[in-house]
Amino acid sequence: MKPLRKQGIIIFSILALVLAACGGGTTEETVEEAAPEVVETLDSPAVTTAAGVKTGVGVTSDPCPAEVGGVPTMADDSKGCIYLGMLNDYTGPYAAVAPALETAQRGFWMWVNSTGGIGDYSVVIREGVDTAYNPQKHLEAYNAQREEVAALAMSLGTPQTLFILDEMDKDNMVGAPMSWYSGWSYKSVDRGLVVEFGSAYCADGMNALDWAMASLPVDIKTIGIMGFAGDYGTDWANGIKYAAEKAGVTVAWEYLPPTLEFDVAQAVGLMVTQPVDAYFPAVGPTQMAQVAGGAFQQGLTPIA
């Protein structure tokens, strides 16, 4: 696993270079030439900033705001501003984790700004737009920001991001999905617009079974899988099933409904009526807590 600091620098470097090449939209653009600059502090490795950032959609010579939504940006008021979009889930199944995801995103760009920004620019994320983890609302949220941002700092969800790819392609809009879908590794899927980071759900599924067989205090011969269809659950399940086939482990059952159709009672019912040696869930934090609580009430102490 890559150290988080190194991984963050790689993501920043890629996005900085892409922003240098993409100004977005059809509005008139100007280019301000900037010599490559190395910015370094005692707390961070050296970062070479991008030269020739284009002004246009989401990029302005005016300074960034000092705060967004009450959160400081650490922007330099003597520099221009690069604006990024935020498509988050504030009211849907991932509302519980939305604040932490957003805090991390904003914190990263605060750090970037505090170490010199990108050439003659600071970077800020605009106010997040609620998608409720719904593809159609995700598109509406994208439309609300597409003329105001140079790239997406975060697009939460795999099906949701796939749903807006056509529009992103029209805008030449790059983004960093909060999603580790294995399809992002293929240009035929992401059209070269996705800033990929981390390991894919499929690989994580393989590793999960491998780790469980080596580390858990049971002889795992049968397993159950639950997750969200068409989301990370399917990708995760495919990895687990592939590893199970190679290891001679039987997948006794799968419960993979669409995200908004996940039934906690049905999931717990499978655990009670079709017991297995280990369970491999890939659901949201709220659903996971409900499933674990329901299983405990039924007398189960699942290994998950």
Regions found by a protein language model. Give the residues of each.
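Extracytoplasmic ligand/sensor domains, especially the bilobed periplasmic-binding protein
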Residues: 69-70, 149-255, 303-304
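Extracytoplasmic "Venus flytrap"
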Residues: 64-78, 85-106, 128-135, 157, ...
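Bacterial N-terminal signal peptides that target proteins for export
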Residues: 1-11
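C-terminal motif of bacterial Sec signal peptides marking the signal peptidase cleavage site
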Residues: 18-21
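Extracellular/periplasmic bilobed ligand-binding domains
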Residues: 171, 237-304
